[in-house]
């Protein structure tokens, strides 16, 4: 499942390279040697800011909080088995932060 971590990193780098000014995205990956590898992406948009974490096991945690009210607009814990499933979650997070 390390491909999920690579997919998240590649997607985040692609977004950043696209130069879209409306939503800012950054990402990090856990240090080598940790027993359970993970990568996470932070998203800041005009409507919300959020974070998505994916572990090599396929577990995903995603949250987004309204900039205006501080309330959660997205909060999920789930498991994915493919890049396609992870992409759908990434898109939901970005959409929540853009609106």
Predicted regions and their residues:
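Negatively charged, low-complexity tracts enriched in Asp/Glu with abundant Ser/Thr
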Residues: 1-46, 68-79
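Mixed-charge, Lys/Arg-enriched low-complexity segments
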Residues: 1-3, 73-99
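Intrinsically disordered, low-complexity regulatory segments enriched in Ser/Thr/Pro
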Residues: 50-80
């Amino acid at each position: 499942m390390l491909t999920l971590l690579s997919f998240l990193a590649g997607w985040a780098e692609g977004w950043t390279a696209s130069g879209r000014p409306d939503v800012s995205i950054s990402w990090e990956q856990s240090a080598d040697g940790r027993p359970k590898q993970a990568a996470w992406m932070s998203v800041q948009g005009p409507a919300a800011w959020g974070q998505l974490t994916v572990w090599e096991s396929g577990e995903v945690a995603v949250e987004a909080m309204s900039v205006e009210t501080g309330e959660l607009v997205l909060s999920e814990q789930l498991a994915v088995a493919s890049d396609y499933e992870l992409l759908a979650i990434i898109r939901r997070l970005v959409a929540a932060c853009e609106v």
